[in-house]
Amino acid sequence: MLNGKTALVTGSTSGIGLGIAKALAAQGANIIVNGFGDADAAKAEIAQAGQGIRVGYHGADMSKAAEIEDMMRYAQSDFGGADILVNNAGIQHVAAIEDFPPERWDAIIAINLTSAFHTTRLALPGMKQKDWGRIINVASTHGLVASAQKSAYVAAKHGIVGFTKVTALETAQTGVTANAICPGWVLTPLVQKQVEARAQKEGIPVEQAKRELVLEKQPSGQFVTPDELGALAVFLSSEAARQVRGAIWNMDGGWVAQ
């Protein structure tokens, strides 16, 4: 379905980004990996998911505009540009507003929000020239609702939601679409560690700890998975989604419906 297309997925060496990259690869897209995790392992997983595709890597620090610009030049020179751009890179810090370190605020806004502006502004000219492109911003349920202690993350994710809508309006009469995915709790290695710590602290089975953690926010009592988010990204990249523009699609087990 995506043969001949190239997808650049930021923050794709693990978790959600890796799941999305593998799903796009399985549909024939070449993949450019980015992130601070094990790049070789991620590239191997992605290559296995998509037989015969090309997989590249650029280790741009998404808080630095100059490195993002270098990554986008790499995408253009080595792959002919990014046809599908998935802005997924993100970090988190939890603290009350009055205790929130200003440098952590700046880093979260830079990586979770400003990086998407830089990748988008640099990808759009090529997409418009081809009259085809897909921009998928990985926001969060925290782009729609808030939780205490997460001021920077919530601000950044609300910003991504607004930025997605503006991008969709500015590309509405082109073959380029822009949409956002808002995951709830996702079962990633980082979250699994939180589950295991809770189980140990409370002396309960891991499965019980997992369910209790999820039920605090998600009525379904089940985690979203990177594979499920990957399937949604594939749909948003498809021709069937050519008129899906500016959608803010939550996949959250009912979190935001409450």
From Swiss-Prot:
It comes from the Bacteria. Substrate binds at S140. It catalyses: (R)-3-hydroxybutanoate + NAD(+) = acetoacetate + NADH + H(+). Its EC number is 1.1.1.30. NAD(+) binds at residues 8-32. The active site is at Y153. One of its GO terms (biological process) is lipid metabolic process. GO terms for molecular function: 3-hydroxybutyrate dehydrogenase activity. Keywords: NAD, Oxidoreductase. Signal peptide: none annotated. Belongs to the short-chain dehydrogenases/reductases (SDR) family. This is D-beta-hydroxybutyrate dehydrogenase. The lineage of its organism: Bacteria, Pseudomonadati, Pseudomonadota, Betaproteobacteria, Burkholderiales.
